[in-house]
Curated annotation (Swiss-Prot):
Substrate binds at residues 27-31, 46, 77, 154, 209, 327. Keywords: Cytoplasm, Decarboxylase, Lyase, Porphyrin biosynthesis. GO terms for biological process: protoporphyrinogen IX biosynthetic process from glutamate. This is Uroporphyrinogen decarboxylase. The gene is hemE. The record marks 77 as: Transition state stabilizer. It comes from the Bacteria. Its main location: cytoplasm. InterPro entries: UROD/MetE-like_sf, Uroporphyrinogen_deCO2ase_HemE, Uroporphyrinogen_deCOase.
Amino acid sequence: MTALKNDRFLRALLKQPVDVTPVWMMRQAGRYLPEYRASRASAGDFMSLCKNPQFACEVTLQPLDRYPLDAAILFSDILTIPDAMGLGLYFETGEGPRFKKTVSTLADIEALPIPDAQQDLGYVMDAVSTIRRELNGRVPLIGFAGSPWTLATYMVEGGSSKDFRKSKAMLYDNPQAMHLLLDKLAQSVTSYLNGQILAGAQAVQIFDSWGGSLSSAAYQEFSLAYMRKIVNGLIRENDGRKVPVIVFTKGGGLWLESIAEIGADTLGLDWTCDIGEARQRVGNKVSLQGNMDPTVLYARPEAIRQEVARILASYGSGTGHVFNLGHGITPEVDPANAGAFINAVHELSAQYHQ
């Protein structure tokens, strides 16, 4: 494989010295970019973008052609796994993801297959190897998956949910069924991420988007325990380099100490945490990724720059910080503001890496 020309993202994750704080954005390939909207129109719909490795590669690289980002992230969706389990993923315009089938009983869950990463999700592995080849060492490529709890909520609810009524009812009424579902998902995610690593992903992130909706006790038992299983089963070295693992629970600021114990290299933070406090709490164990409120990107460039400066100062000197948003960039953001954000991180962070 081609040598990396810019490895500061991987170095920061592993707490090795860097020249400036690396930066990338969750959903950096997305609807805020006119070139992405054009590609999506050419592909026909969102799933065609995901399932065609050439389109997935094209949109993964678009933000890198526009901005000096320090990492690329595979263009895909967390719901590829439930789709491969036979639930029939589709997208309603303006509605978000839906499933043709849901799971509601122990029998439904027992009948679910564990997808084979190469056979059932081969299009994702093809996308990873295509992107890695096209990147040609520019920056590292991040692979990703949803956490078991987050995937389970979509499978039980049949789509997005505000209150997770059905998923939580199953968790409390029928914990045996929920544990079986989460166990199958943990096995599926482990083999899926390992497939991505073998196809060329140089770091992986587990997105626990809905872990923060749980009580403390339920979070430990139904979300964190299964992420620990995944982390323990991942390939941690490939191609002569360590493969860092990032775990991101949105709304997980209460539980950073517990999350830092599961063996991941890096904790993702949402914008409700103070990154300086997070560093004091867990910085001796893990590196940190985050954590600007994505809606700051609707403000003027000077205000964006000020907020970047505040977060950098809060983290302080030294490595172990990858700058990111506290959640995904939203569709109405002006691409120029995203550029102002990325430039501000590089320009203002050099002083912290003398």
